[in-house]
């Protein structure tokens, strides 16, 4: 399990764009399960939509990408790198995410060859599928 302090040591993202609150399980270099607690105080609900707050799908995908980044950085060979979003395939949304929901984020690295990685990802709320996709990343060194 990784708390927010450990997550910030791995990911360069910060408020308001850090979308992973806690990592609840890790299979080193392979799979990560994390959570994002969606509260009524999220900045994006001010405009999406004030009378009917729904988490933007692109931010659900970003939370999944960040979870994938944590999975990739668990490999010793990738320490000090960043996974840059390079593509997405088969993305489907099945359920809305609203204030009070807890997103369960799962990312499994399916391919890591050179500087390219792929992850199969899915987000659920209370067991209901929210989103699934395959995300591709280009690994790059973090600037010093």
UniProtKB/Swiss-Prot annotation:
InterPro entries xref list: FabA_FabZ (IPR013114), FabZ (IPR010084), HotDog_dom_sf (IPR029069)
E.C. no: 4.2.1.59
A single MF term (Gene Ontology): (3R)-hydroxyacyl-[acyl-carrier-protein] dehydratase activity
Leader sequence residues: none
Keyword flag Cytoplasm: yes
Uppermost EC category: lyase
An individual GO BP term: fatty acid biosynthetic process
Active site annotation, chain numbering: 48
Pfam families: FabA
PANTHER family to which the protein is assigned, alphabetical: 3-HYDROXYACYL-[ACYL-CARRIER-PROTEIN] DEHYDRATASE (PTHR30272:SF1)
Family, as annotated: Belongs to the thioester dehydratase family. FabZ subfamily.
Described function: Involved in unsaturated fatty acids biosynthesis. Catalyzes the dehydration of short chain beta-hydroxyacyl-ACPs and long chain saturated and unsaturated beta-hydroxyacyl-ACPs.
HAMAP family: FabZ
Name of protein: 3-hydroxyacyl-[acyl-carrier-protein] dehydratase FabZ
Organism: Listeria welshimeri serovar 6b (strain ATCC 35897 / DSM 20650 / CCUG 15529 / CIP 8149 / NCTC 11857 / SLCC 5334 / V8)
Higher taxonomy: Bacteria, Bacillati, Bacillota, Bacilli, Bacillales
